[in-house]
């Protein structure tokens, strides 16, 4: 089974990818991870990507698609995979198609901007031990203090409301159109975000006929 997980930042794609990876016994192909691995291993596309990154430039789509294609050709992807991080745009989706990379299903986790703002802006992390909290869902016993080590709890820059809002704007402009792209191909399966991680996982598996 070859899957794409779509959803706004904060929709829980990474968490759901981990669960699906276990349930379906297929690997999650994270674009960030395979990009770093390609650079570390010195592959031709990895070296090309590194040249752009060293110059402080964005890695072009054709290089990203090349790295993804290399990774999907490995043995552990023969029975399927969960694609995470690419495509982010219509151009990338079209490039994947042109490269002969196909998918069986595209899951879109549906969640409101308001819920995402609440979810992400409530996150706190211990600057000493890295433990994670949420001011509503998993609050610390003492506000601003880590239960585990007594360290200071801080809000990451990525979780600040203004940053979250900016990321959502980019998602709606560049990535959300992929839903129509894959709906036209009969691949899109929208799944409503549920109150718990487990319920969302069950809804995704149900949409996949599992």
What positions do the PLM features span?
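Glycine-rich phosphate-binding loop of ATP-dependent small-molecule kinases
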Residues: 1-210
């Amino acid at each position: 089974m070859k899957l794409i997980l779509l959803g706004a930042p904060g929709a829980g794609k990474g968490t759901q990818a981990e669960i699906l990876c276990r349930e379906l016994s297929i690997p999650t192909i994270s674009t960030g991870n395979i990009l770093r691995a390609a650079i570390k291993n010195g592959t031709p596309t990895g070296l090309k990507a590194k040249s752009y990154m060293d110059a402080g430039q964005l890695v072009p789509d054709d290089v990203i698609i090349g790295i993804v294609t290399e990774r999907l050709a490995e043995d552990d992807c023969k029975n399927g995979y969960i694609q995470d991080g690419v495509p982010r745009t219509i151009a990338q989706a079209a490039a994947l198609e042109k490269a002969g990379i196909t998918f069986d299903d595209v899951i879109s986790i549906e969640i409101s901007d308001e819920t995402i703002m609440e979810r992400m802006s409530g996150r706190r992390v211990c600057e000493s031990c890295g433990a994670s909290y949420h001011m509503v869902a998993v609050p610390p016993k003492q506000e601003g203090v880590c239960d585990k080590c007594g360290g200071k709890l801080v809000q990451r820059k990525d979780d600040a409301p203004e940053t979250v809002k900016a990321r959502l704007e980019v998602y709606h402009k560049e990535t959300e159109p992929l839903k129509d792209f894959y709906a036209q191909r009969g691949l899109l399966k929208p799944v409503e975000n549920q109150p718990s991680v487990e319920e969302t996982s069950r809804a995704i598996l149900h949409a996949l006929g599992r």
